């Protein structure tokens, strides 16, 4: 079973991602954080959160969130040797080239527009990459 950390402030998008995993029978244990700060708390075991162990095998990350956005979180994540190798898959409503370039320089594994919902027969690059990361 794969451990997945979903960093997403929208409950609808969280539920949609969960349904997509179930639809494709992707065995997973989903952990959620509602912003980058909460995600770091989970990874580091700070501010009363128990450290998430084992570490997630993949992080699904929204870019636009309150308190600490996805780029700020990704910058801190990549600065830590303990977390630098965790694959990060961006899920966002932003299709701006500047966001894509910023995330590429921080070593993301993939970028997909929301919602993270795949239909049977979907052959998109995002679906193939996500399946590769989660299997």
Question: Which role does the model predict for each range below?
Answer:
Residues 26, 54-57, 82-87:
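His-Asp phosphorelay/catalytic-motif detector in bacterial-type signaling
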Residues 94-98:
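Negatively charged, flexible loop motifs adjacent to catalytic sites
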